[in-house]
Amino acid sequence: MGILLALSTYAVLGIFLVLLCGRLLTSWKAARIVRGYAPSPPFTPCLVLKVVGDILFLSRLLRTNDLLWIGEWLFHCTFPLVVLRHLVFFLNPVPEWVGFLQPFGIFAGYVLPLSLIYIFTVKLSREKGYFPSYNFFLLILLLLLSMTGILLRTVFKPDLVAVKGFVLGILGLSLQSVPLDFLFVIHFSLVLVFILYLPTHIFAAPLVMLDARQREEELRRVMHGEKR
């Protein structure tokens, strides 16, 4: 089982990196084509602040769907904390800042499934039954991940030393035996499925948001007859 999980991890990470590189390359080419037709306006502090607001506070979503924004913002706050908390299993020695984040990550782990349930409920009610199967699958997958994580934290506690040894063994190409915990195997397998289905466009989102803001600024200048 340990060898199977390790080989699956290498395969999933390889596929993910290929897809990610392809997405970034496509976004870069698309941006070059757009700039060829219409040069981008210069960077300004105001433009940068707007992009930061789009990324950190989901300001665009707030303007269009304030009810959904609540759940989405909670998710975007808690999910990174949960991921960062898990670095304790990937790093040896563990940096102090990772240790500092542990209580925040644990608390975020309990809030995360609530935000997912909220998002699911709002989408079903607002979109009147239309729910793309991909979004539905991703939400259910994240919910299963968070719930199995909570169970591993509170009820079916695995041997954390064995878990860390197994993970570090995969990273160091020195395979270790998988912890004898069925729920951990399920949780780890769900992580691999999530990585495989993770939408790679989110990594290009900052560039897309910046380009969109630049286009808006250029359009505003044209409409109001402003000079650069």
Predicted regions and their residues:
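Membrane-embedded alpha-helical bundles of multi-pass integral membrane proteins
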Residues: G2-R228
